[in-house]
Amino acid sequence: MAPPEIGNDEIPLQEFGQKSFAADNTIGGMQSISYDNSGAPMGLYKEKKGMYVTARNLSMSIGTEKKGDKRNILSDLNFFLKPGSMVLILGSPGCGKTSVMKALANQLHSETVSGSLLFNGKAANKSTHHRDVAYVVQGDHHMAPFTVRETFKFSADLQMSEGTSEEEKNARVDYILKTLDLTRQQDTVVGNEFLRGVSGGQKKRVTIGVEMVKDAGLFLMDEPSTGLDSTTTLELMKHFRELSNVNQVSSLVALLQPGVEVTKLFDFLMIMNAGHMVYFGPMSDAISYFEGLGFKLPKHHNPAEFFQEIVDEPELYFEGEGEPPLRGAEEFANAYKNSAMFQSIVNDLDNTQPDLTFCKDSSHLPKYPTPLSYQIRLASIRAFKMLISSQVAVRMRIIKSIVMGLILGSLFYGLDLNQTDGNNRSGLIFFSLLFIVFSGMGAIAILFEQREVFYIQKDGKYYKTFAFFLSLIFSEIPIALLETVVFCVLVYWMCGLQANAEKFIYFLLMNFVGDLAFQSFFKMVSAFAPNATLASVIAPAALAPFILFSGFMAPKRSIGGWWIWIYWISPIKYAFEGLMSNEHHGLIYSCDDSETIPPRNTPNFELPYPRGSGNSSICQITRGDQFLDQLGMPQNNWFKWIDLLIVFAFGALFSFGMYFFLKNVHVDHRASDPKNDKRSKKASKRSKKIKDSKVDIKENRMVKAQKEIPIGCYMQWKDLVYEVDVKKDGKNQRLRLLNEINGYVKPGMLLALMGPSGAGKSTLLDVLANRKTGGHTKGQILINGQERTKYFTRLSAYVEQFDVLPPTQTVKEAILFSAKTRLPSDMPNEEKIKFVENIIETLNLLKIQNKQIGHGEEGLSLSQRKRVNIGVELASDPQLLFLDEPTSGLDSSAALKVMNLIKKIASSGRSIICTIHQPSTSIFKQFDHLLLLKRGGETVYFGPTGDKSADLLGYFENHGLICDPLKNPADFILDVTDDVIETTLDGKPHQFHPVQQYKESQLNSDLLAKIDAGVMPVGTPVPEFHGVYSSSYQTQFVELGKRSWLAQVRRVQNIRTRLMRSLFLGVVLGTLFVRMEETQENIYNRVSILFFSLMFGGMSGMSSIPIVNMERGVFYREQASGMYSIPIYLFTFIVTDLPWVFLSAIIYTVPMYFISGLRLDPNGAPFFYHSFISFTTYFNFSMLAMVFATVLPTDEIAHALGGVALSISSLFAGFMIPPASIAKGWHWFYQLDPTTYPLAIVMINEFQDLEFHCTSSESVTIPNVLTVNGTYIDVGPICPITNGNQILQRYEMKPEDKYKFLAVIFGYSVFFFICIFIALKFIRHQTK
């Protein structure tokens, strides 16, 4: 059967619908295309274009995590697209729609493709194919701080051809804003979960708009209607219908719940299921094809729903007796391949020569529409805007530099030229460098924030990777320069480093270059790491050897030959070496009385030898070069410039690594876990297809509470107003989002909240559900005739629009967790499990019940997440249920099933309020009441819908607005909601003002009277609750502990990396100081190894920040639902992390301790005590990381301040600067430092009564010592330190504190626990 002719102004008549669409007047907010004299659309395209696509035996597979294993995604597809035609893809999520589009867009990465895929008779030209294709992806990934207009303009600047004038670009942006009804939002930021921006539906239109900028011949749109109401979807598809008719553009569109009028706009239909094609052919022949197989479309049934459901539930449409002749994707696909329809399509593929008259040929064009210099400029401008918009992060970086500069400046204020301050200069230089290094950890979050957008734009060839890479570098320079200058000025001049302009400039340059270099290092790690959590683990582990082998903690002569290569490749070594040479070279040092050997301030110093020291002593270091010599550094002044060049070269190397990984690595999470697949297959064997009529809510125990309390919940609200604070013209004002809303819901009632995008539906739902965290609410809300109490969460549940779910749980575990924590504690576990199993079956989740939910693209699809989200809330068996867009992201079959379930829950006596965007006729019939809002949050209608929407439509008919009998009533009411409409009433012209007419209506008067009288009948029993939580504390502890433990063990990569990092660094540190003897040199090495071991615990702890941040969103949702107590949540989270903290500490400590030769007694007591202190220190640092993750809003800021805290802790612990050298004004900080006490304990544990000796090179000879005989002799050799107690005295550590300080360590654990609890209870970083 030949496809219909293309190029006509109208598409063929559909057998199941009405006359097809032709160019129409403007409807609602979106604009119809305007034409110039030549018939071309004004402001968008200037020439006709199109693309002829043919696919023969197209198949695709992708590798799994199991080596050598492949998973089929597409199987043997045959289809075509012609210029001017529109093809609709239907199929349940996971059917392969996205894979088809990626293949057509030539955006494949790890997939293996076979078969033939031709574009205008040729294979895809990899260089220019993207210039002819516009691909609207499923997800809405944008730079959150950019406004809608800026987002479109950026796309226009880079996707419109070189030479296009600014006027043309702006005209196209204006056109798209008007077309997508975003003109009013053009100056609103796009936003994300942390930054309030446009609504979900508006964000989807932004996603579409950035691709509409292109002069594309082929439009690919993957579920563009998600989050849009039905009217907006229809208008959008009409626009593309016009575009196809006039400009011969070929379109392939995947939709989930298309209405009849939307479906009629398409020429061809493609139905997919599980990667198989079960139909491709003319839309007009689709129904007759399936009727030929024995499946009939019921009367008044949406054909799109019929097409989507027929493979999964063939028994619903089979006319004959017995079992349907076909079941499953493969059987339907084989039937199609054996049909005359398929043969007709194959003949067209084989015999039809592509008519390229209307086809745009871009093969002669350059790969990118704009030159590289222009790409770099635009990408850099965007990066600078991103930087400026992140005001909190920028301020934190500057404040951090000022604070640290002042701390160091006052701590090391006015350094002298004695021995102690000579060492302090070295410590200051090393610490300053570490501060610069660790400040770069915030770059991990910066890159991950932009990475998904970069992937999309890289695939779309907006710019070369090099342009994006340079934008990251350029945008970092100003802020790095500013924070470096502030820090260096304070540190250098307050500390009294050499007052020399050249040396100061060098100090500034080295720190600045080092800052940029390590920013690039952290971004390089982020470019290849699969997620931010692993990046936060890998980066410190890779950095630790560089720090250890920098020459400060382990001088060059102490490093064994097997590790000396790390010393030579450590960038920190060269930076430290350059700064040390810059400061120490040329300085002359002296000794205070206490610093000479022997000290001049000893009582017998002036007595002749051997009764005293004969008034003679030696000052060991008198020149700065001797400090350099001790560390094995060059003693000439010019080599520091070589060091600077080497650090710059390392920065360039890290930058190249970042560029390489950005260019060549594209993290793709679609490769499934074989264990998940295996579990899912087992589950699918047990699954049974059930009709909705078989879902007995009472058997499912969804009316358990009703047996105890015969009613649901009465809720009423009056004069409800909601306002938010905004700034306009520099003044604080209040913007009203809801304006005097009235309404109610009662048991058995299913109330729909509807209105166009931006009308305030979700806002109203949040206010009613008590989920708003900001703004100002006025008016009255009563629950069962009383004000809302703290027990409100016991009787209510809220299905949020955004599906925030625990990523490591399986589907069944997530729903079961909700049931066990929210159902009554006296309900047996067996009944709870049965209850959950019925929910899983009803929501068609049985096949994936054992699959992990995952995060982002990793794990479940959008549709599956939505159903799991609904299941989690249904598991609480609520009396009052709020749902925000429960069908968004679902196909029509799944959406109808969900709404049937919700309707039955309402029928069982529950009260339900539900926002909904684009309900089909079948779905809209489920609602018995409607609250209709217009933009601005004003009521247009509140009342019953009536049988077949008779009451609702009757209200509008009374005002002269008649709904076409074949039109979906839901679409009709949205069409007439917003504007004043000119109509006729009783034969006279009439203006319909939606809000005013409702206020004056009898409906409104009756509603107000009912609310004033009270919705709840007098004498109705009210449920009483005796606790905030449904479950006992014991149940909460068990369930939270189980979930938290499984979350830990399922992060396999994280655990593996975490433990390998500990083992690696333990072996490295142990072999660096292998079998230390009790010599003078090894005194300092022992102190270094003990200090580094503790600080490694700090670095290890900070890597948990992304995990805590990821869990935080789930916690916010569950806490708002009243699932569990905060202390129990926190306690179980910490307890389940303890084994991994213990393993990390032990795996590090064992090789480090025994290989290095730290102190051992026959009973092993020093080792066990050291291990215990290491474990407690690691645990405290892990708790400190949780404090930062819960208190601070983003990963970037938490990492930045966590690095600062770690730096300050290491500074005041007593290693960098001995306690005696700490200024009195800062001594309290030394005493507050949580690292001070474990360091003191492990030092006492190691050095107490330990004997030391000197090698021949370490002993000191004192010349010209006066003896009792009156002669002068050389006395020596003298060993400066012979007992470890001398070291303890130098660091002001007392042996009796070895066990006393344990109480302080545990005190910090309690303190951090309290801080985390307070943060979880009172701080929310997600605003509503």
Swiss-Prot record:
Residues 388-665, 1049-1286 form the ABC transmembrane type-2 domain. Disruption phenotype: Cells that have a abcG2-abcG18 disruption have an endocytosis rate roughly 70% that of wild-type (or rtoA disrupted cells). Disruption on abcG2-abcG18-rtoA cells have an endocytosis rate roughly 20% that of wild-type. The exocytosis rates of abcG2-abcG18 and abcG2-abcG18-rtoA disrupted cells are roughly that of wild-type; abcG2-abcG18 endosomes have an unusually high pH, whereas abcG2-abcG18-rtoA endosomes have an almost normal pH. Residues 53-299, 721-960 form the ABC transporter domain. It is a multi-pass membrane protein. It comes from the Eukaryota. InterPro entries: AAA+_ATPase, ABC2_TM, ABC_transporter-like_ATP-bd, ABC_transporter-like_CS, ABCG_dom, ABCG_PDR_2, P-loop_NTPase. One of its GO terms (cellular component) is endosome membrane. The chain crosses the membrane at residues 398-418, 428-448, 477-497, 504-524, 534-554, 559-579, 642-662, 1059-1076, 1087-1107, 1128-1148, 1172-1192, 1197-1217, 1303-1323. The keyword Transport applies. Residues 670-691 are annotated as: Disordered. Belongs to the ABC transporter superfamily. ABCG family. PDR (TC 3.A.1.205) subfamily. This is ABC transporter G family member 2. It comes from Dictyostelium discoideum (Social amoeba).
